[in-house]
Amino acid sequence: MAAHCQVTGAEPGFGHSISHSHRRNKRRFDPNIQKKRYWVPSLRRNVTLQVSARGIKTIDVRGIDVVVAAILARGVKL
């Protein structure tokens, strides 16, 4: 599963793991991606989205219809 949120666009960040002796190792900071299924009344069907935890909160606040309309306007197939 790609570490990419369909709602917020969150992608992995890159940085370093730093040990006690301050040696640096490259690492990747992945967003908290969850696979969630939502019922979308305007489409009258279920839609499965890969969303971050922040994306889930965005859906709770704005509503699934508004969020799905924005995703479809970007040309993403659901």
Curated annotation (Swiss-Prot):
Source species: Arthrobacter sp. (strain FB24)
Source species taxonomy: Bacteria, Bacillati, Actinomycetota, Actinomycetes, Micrococcales
UniProt keyword annotations, A-Z: Ribonucleoprotein, Ribosomal protein
Record's protein name: Large ribosomal subunit protein bL28
Gene Ontology BP term (one): translation
Span list, region Disordered: 1-31
Molecular functions per Gene Ontology: structural constituent of ribosome
Gene3D superfamilies tied to this protein: Ribosomal protein L28/L24
Sequence similarity: Belongs to the bacterial ribosomal protein bL28 family.
